[in-house]
Amino acid sequence: MSTKAIEIKQQKADVITEQLKNSVSTIIVDYRGLTVAQVTELRKQLREAGVEFKVYKNTLVRRSAAAAGIEGIDEFLTGPNAIAFSTEEVVAPAKIIADFAKENEALEIKAGIIEGTVTSAEDVKAIASLPSKEGLISMVLSVLQAPIRNFAYAVKAVGEQQGGEETAAEEA
């Protein structure tokens, strides 16, 4: 192999290593059996969520995972794989891929790397069932707002009740 080819492969491996290090959620899937149109649709959905979806050689991914300090991923790197990298959202790629896999049985979730920890396909599917970051924030905010809202309703009711008593006293 020429030194130029080795250099190109090393550059690709460096890119993959950086993606693995910077990613909070990485999902590995087997895409065999999907049509080009289906893969394009999946890429579109992932891109809209800010997730990068790439196909790399398994050897490069193995080297990159070792360089990034990720262990236990080798067993999942067999056959054709595609990898979804998300640097911002843990749940989004898992949710999009799990939903897509329900509609397209040819797509198989193999494993995930969530915040540096290798997880099984079952764990990825469990993460997919969680609400998104925005959903969790809205849940927390509604829980925090409930006591304030109830207090405001109580103050309003007391004010209306006192206003009603004053009107009754004026009429008498």
UniProtKB/Swiss-Prot annotation:
Q: Name the UniProt key words of this record, in alphabetical order.
A: Ribonucleoprotein, Ribosomal protein, RNA-binding, rRNA-binding
- GO BP annotations listed: translation
An example of a Gene Ontology cellular component annotation for this protein is: ribonucleoprotein complex
Q: Which domain of life is it from?
A: Bacteria
Keyword rRNA-binding belongs to the record: yes
GO MF entries? large ribosomal subunit rRNA binding
Secretion signal, residue range per the UniProt entry: none
Does this UniProt record's set of keywords contain Ribosomal protein?
A: yes
Q: Into which family does the record put it?
A: Belongs to the universal ribosomal protein uL10 family.
Listed under subunit, the entry gives: Part of the ribosomal stalk of the 50S ribosomal subunit. The N-terminus interacts with L11 and the large rRNA to form the base of the stalk. The C-terminus forms an elongated spine to which L12 dimers bind in a sequential fashion forming a multimeric L10(L12)X complex.
| Record function comment | Forms part of the ribosomal stalk, playing a central role in the interaction of the ribosome with GTP-bound translation factors.
- The protein's name is Large ribosomal subunit protein uL10
- Species whose genome carries this gene: Macrococcus caseolyticus (strain JCSC5402)
Q: What gene, per UniProt, encodes this protein?
A: rplJ
